[in-house]
From Swiss-Prot:
It is found in: Lysosome. Belongs to the peptidase C1 family. It is an enzyme of class 3 (hydrolase). It comes from the Eukaryota. SMART domains: Inhibitor_I29 (SM00848), Pept_C1 (SM00645). This is Cathepsin L. The lineage of its organism: Eukaryota, Metazoa, Spiralia, Lophotrochozoa, Platyhelminthes. The keyword Glycoprotein applies. Glycans are attached at N212, N216, N231. InterPro entries: Papain-like_cys_pep_sf, Pept_asp_AS, Pept_cys_AS, Pept_his_AS, Peptidase_C1A, Peptidase_C1A_C, Peptidase_C1A_papain-like, Prot_inhib_I29. The keyword Nucleotidyltransferase does not apply. Its EC number is 3.4.22.15. GO terms for biological process: proteolysis.
Length: 319
């Protein structure tokens, strides 16, 4: 039975009606009268839920109204997350030690500043985060090899990756294997995103990039940061429960709010840093558009496996 948060002392703001109107205008939401009443009730419930997160989480993150404040937890999970991930049983190709390289990295680093990261994209109402995390990684790896930043097709993976399930979820580790079998990825412009499962329209003569293999990376976040610095961006899985209401700051939830064993979202590590308050963090690219979070990005505490962000880290390899 859901907990009534108002009984716990959380209160709706007096201008909640006005906030709802502003929310609909800002995010261009339109509902019929009956649907509007349902969404307003969900909106109010989510405001209280965001207050709960704000009080009982660590870190400097601010939680509140976002583009997804009109969705229930189940609706949000079904349309923006993916099925629960299974941690790979074999990590035989995991680099166990980077030696001196671990201590030879800067305090702050961001692949965006190197021109290695494409613009933030939007998966829409489709559980294809795994495809965006994968293409983001391949885009950066291709840039590192050739110096060319190309925007690659997520829709190709949604439609043609036989190891995954399109808008119903998937895994970057499977996607890498499928990319190799398909011979590579087409450009976004030549196979544009449509946010739904469709028939495969892959044209092998239209493939723009290739990969040779993939690698499962260490769960040690110090070594992950070193790998990112010396190599490229990293595809990771995480528990994204709190991200529904994330606005900005460094997210650092207690494990009870964000179990590392319940991974349901794929994102892309593009950098790392340390805040003025000495909080180590990851810079993470999401696939929910630029109106969410910090212009489509968020920062997650680095060092204690918050939300399982270090649990399943992978990358394509291009020789």
């Amino acid at each position: 039975m859901p907990v009534n948060l108002e009984y716990l002392g959380f209160k709706l703001p007096g201008n909640v009606d006005e906030k709802y109107v502003q929310f609909k205008l800002k995010y261009r939401k339109q509902y019929h009268e009956t649907e509007d009443e349902i969404r307003f009730n969900i909106f109010k419930s989510n405001i209280l839920k965001a207050q709960l997160y704000q009080v009982f989480v660590r870190g400097s993150a601010i939680y509140g109204v976002t583009p997804y404040s009109d969705l229930t937890t189940d609706e949000f999970a079904r349309t923006h997350l993916t099925a629960s991930w299974v941690v790979p049983s074999s990590r035989s190709n995991t680099p166990t030690s980077l030696g001196k390289e671990v201590n030879n990295i800067p305090k702050n680093f961001d692949w965006r500043e190197k021109g290695a990261v494409t613009e933030v994209k939007n998966q829409g109402m489709c559980g294809s985060c795994w495809a965006f995390s994968t293409t983001g990684n391949v885009e950066s790896q291709w840039f590192r090899k050739t110096g060319k930043l190309l925007s690659l097709s997520e829709q190709q993976l949604v439609d043609c990756d036989g190891l995954d399930d399109g808008c119903n979820g998937g895994l970057p580790s499977n996607a890498y294997e499928s990319i190799i079998k398909m011979g590579g990825l087409m450009l976004e412009d030549n196979y544009p995103y449509d946010a739904k499962n469709e028939k495969c329209h892959l044209k092998t003569d239209g493939v723009a990039v290739y990969i040779n293999s993939s690698v499962n990376l260490t769960q040690d976040e110090t070594e992950l940061a070193a790998w990112l610095y010396h190599n490229s961006t990293i595809s990771v899985g995480m528990n994204a429960l709190l991200l529904q209401f994330y606005q900005h700051g460094i997210s650092h939830p207690w494990w009870i709010f964000c179990s590392k064993y319940l991974l349901d979202h794929a994102v892309l590590l593009v950098g790392y840093g340390v805040s003025e308050k000495n909080e180590p963090f990851w810079i993470v690219k999401n696939s929910w558009g630029v109106e969410w979070g910090e212009n489509g990005y968020f920062r997650m505490y680095r060092g204690d496996g918050s939300c399982g962000i270090n649990t399943v880290a992978t990358s394509a390899m291009i020789y």
